[in-house]
Regions:
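Hydrophobic faces of well-ordered beta-strands that scaffold small-molecule active sites
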Residues: 2-6, 30-32, 53, 62-66, ...
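Conserved, mostly hydrophobic/aromatic
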Residues: 15, 22, 33, 78, ...
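Glycine-rich, proline-tolerant flexible connector loops at the mouths of alpha/beta enzymes
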Residues: 31-47, 138-146
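Glycine-rich phosphate-binding active-site loops on the catalytic face of alpha/beta enzymes
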Residues: 88-94, 134-144, 182-203
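C-terminal helical cap(s) of enzyme catalytic domains, especially alpha/beta-barrels
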Residues: 195-222, 226-231
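Catalytic cores of alpha/beta
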Residues: 19, 72-80, 118-128, 171-187
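Histidine/lysine/aspartate-rich catalytic loop segments that bind and position anionic ligands
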Residues: 113-151, 157
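Alpha-helix-loop-beta-strand connector modules within alpha/beta enzyme cores
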Residues: 43-64, 102-111, 151-167, 206-215
Length: 236
């Protein structure tokens, strides 16, 4: 299981120290939520912050979640800033196949996200052009929302289509075990990680939960579930 802490829950007054602490704790992925205030209500950060983070860390895998309209306009800019993977939203792109293909042509991993009310049927046609699927288990834009229980069925359905799975940013106890049981291999966690230092011990708790799938393993917060495409190399 790979743990990908969400930067939004980090201390923005000391990001360089946060990155160093993540690497010291054995973290290999960093989840970066990009919001534009249009596709979702909030505004977060953009390429300059990612570029600054990349200058501080050449080892972390930057998992960049684009919650923005017309993401195809910014692919090269995010690549140049240091993104390793770009995840676009099915609802925000009129031509997702073209955009996913372009992301991969630019040398990055390509992911596709689906909001809670969006059907995953297009995966039948888009799967060859992507590396990962992100199933949102809350409506995007705000942290701390209640996990939508129907998401479990959606995760299982997507796993059936892709035969690989991962997970996002959690809220309630016992959710972690159920998502792991469904086949999760990437957990994205915000305040459940950054709010429970020291990071090395928190990382160990998540790893223990992955091994045992115990209902009380960790009080994680889940906002999404990412499913990896079979046959594609998973960066660890």
């Amino acid at each position: 299981m790979i743990l990908s802490p969400s930067l939004l829950s980090a201390d923005f007054s000391r990001l360089a120290d946060e990155l160093a602490a993540l690497e010291a704790a054995g973290i290999s992925w960093l989840h970066l939520d990009i919001m534009d205030g249009a596709f979702v209500p909030n505004i977060t950060f953009g390429q300059p912050v990612i570029q600054s983070l990349r200058q501080r860390s050449s080892q972390l895998f930057f998992d960049v979640h684009l919650m923005i309209e017309e993401p195809a306009r910014y692919l090269e800019a995010f690549r140049d800033a240091g993104a390793d993977m770009l995840v676009i939203h099915a609802e925000a792109d009129r031509h997702p196949q073209r955009t996913l293909s372009e992301i991969r042509r630019l040398g990055m991993k390509a992911g596709l996200a689906f909001n809670p009310g969006t059907d995953i049927a297009p995966l039948r046609w888009l799967a060859p052009d992507l590396d990962m699927v992100l199933i949102m288990s809350v409506n995007p834009g705000f942290s701390g929302q209640k996990f939508i229980p129907q998401s479990f069925d959606k995760i299982r359905a997507t796993r059936t289509m892709l035969n690989a799975a991962g997970a996002g940013d959690w809220r309630e106890r016992a959710k972690l075990a159920r998502v792991l049981t469904a086949g999760a291999d990437v957990l994205v966690s915000g305040s459940a990680f950054f709010g429970h230092p020291p990071y090395d011990r928190c990382h160990q708790r998540f790893q223990a939960a992955a091994r045992t799938a115990a209902d009380n393993a960790h009080d994680a917060r889940c906002a999404a579930a990412a499913l990896w495409q079979p046959g594609r190399a998973l960066k660890k």
